[in-house]
Amino acid sequence: MNARLSTPMNSRIPSQNLAHQAKTKRMVQLALMISIIFVMAFSPLGYLRTPGLTITFLTVPVAVGAVLMGPLAGAVCGLAFGITSLITAMTGGSPFSSMLLSINPLALAFTCLVPRVLEGWLCGLIFAALRPRFKNASYFIACLACPLLNTVLFMSSLILFFYNTDYVQGLAASLGASHPLIFVILFVGIQGAIEAAACTVLGSAVSRTLAAALKR
């Protein structure tokens, strides 16, 4: 009788171990993605800087994390991206962000963090929604959505909090923009197109390769 009673308990032990291993594996993978984001952010790998443009590739690991591990992981990767942007502003790595920090620190913190969290979360949701019906295209669409969401959400927050400041009004005047939408188009311009193309190509290629390797 004791043997019979112990059998169900013993059968649960392997499943509990497997669940623990899966959780640990997932946390390790997420930690790796966050580490990649920080390494890229503070090295030449994360940005292509030219006299007129600063193009970021940090949307690539955010998109890969969202695609491989889901919306929550995407949000965490987006948060890591936002934290690096805030650190860059605080350390003077970006003159534009540093100026916004001096104008309104709380608004800049919101602008750096919240759009990036939403970017990763929404990217994961888009992939999860499309994957059952569009197995291959879902990688492409999700990785395209990530930089587009980053641009739209970041610029929306920028317009909301900073458009009426003297600094941004000066930038708008220098670009010849008399309307917020025109300012966004001129301000983002070719930079946004390059970021979208890079994330779409690199993100979809990396995520599909890793998904196949991880059998997902």
Predicted regions and their residues:
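Loop-helix junctions at membrane interfaces
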Residues: 1-216
